[in-house]
Amino acid sequence: MTADEDRIVDLLRRLDPEPVRPVRVDLTAAVHEARRRRRSRRTMSVSAAGLAVLAAVSVPLVVGGGPSAGPASQPASPSTSGSAPATIAPPATTAPGGPTACTAQPLPVPGGHAKSLVTGGDPTGRFLAGRSYPGDGRGNPVILWDGDRAREYRLPGSDQRMVDVNAAGVAVGSVYLDDRPQPYVIRNGRPARLPGLASGEATAVSADGRIVGARQIGDRQRPVLWSDPDTAAVELPLPGPRWEGTAIGVDSAGTVVGKIHDGPSGVTRTAVWRAGGGGPELLPTPSVEGGPASEFVAHSLRGGWITGVAFRDEGKVRRIYPARYHLATGRYEPLPSGVSPSAGNGRGWVVGPVDRMDAGLLTDAGTLRLPDLDGRTGRYAAVAVSVSDDAAVIGGQLDVEPGQKSLVMRAIRWSCR
């Protein structure tokens, strides 16, 4: 692989799941043009031309952070306007915990298709959501795994994906139909379009069936909430008329977390909507090594923990500081350098790429690299996208033919102990 190819593949690891672009890390905070393309769904299929364009608009990314990233601890005070950066607190003192070993197992794929992905998982580890790539021109069959049992769903349109699932097996996501994204739910074994949106997507579902996502209006998005799968979506209030964005997490207490920005060129802010209504609280950005972060982009909400990445711009270099935010205490905590969280669990543990080579699990005990099918680590294109609250089950994918010119991604469950 050439240096240019390596750079492109590394960039694609940070985009939404496809067989040739394994992991989803939101580049909207780094490249607003990439946000515009994703919203218009022009990145839903990758071509050689698309790779060149994406590489051209990218900026240098340098991973920073780690336990020494922040000064002395200080709680973060949410606000609805600009605020001083919040200092990242040292990691909480807790007893060491978490798995010390994992094994990888391919998930069964109906039809035996060579390429498949995991796109989400539930907090208990029982359910995983994903999709396969039959290449028959009918889009991507959605798969729900209940343990080792796999069920395939043929949804209308193309680019079908379920991105989250709860402990009851309710899965949410979207399809691309009639030249626009449309939100979908699978409940009790039956797929259905979510009501109230002409165009949009569902991004997360709570234990009690609340669903969040975004309404699509041209190139803009506005965060929405479905109180249940049968009730029409309602837009969540924003700080002003130019603001836009999407909700990315919801819990059974009614707390919603989202990523919003003031106009197409505004910096990304993490927003929190509490139960009972009212405008969003805008979390301050953390202080990181070298000064205040430019942005903090949330990726997931689970058990009161928001996991994501902070960015600090230093000239033409954008530095990345993985971090998590605890809603109950109002504190940021740094995550070790080299870990880029793609999902978190109810204990604040995260999974994601490690040092551009492996997928990893970060717990209070440290970082555990996830093995390949033969128990090794260090081969490119291992991707983790979901982690159960006890970290016993991690969903993701592996390149099962490493060293070849093209990636052959296969849906994987890591069982950890």
Language model segments and positions:
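Residue-level hotspots at or immediately adjacent to binding/recognition sites across diverse folds
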Residues: L15, S40-T43, S58-R417
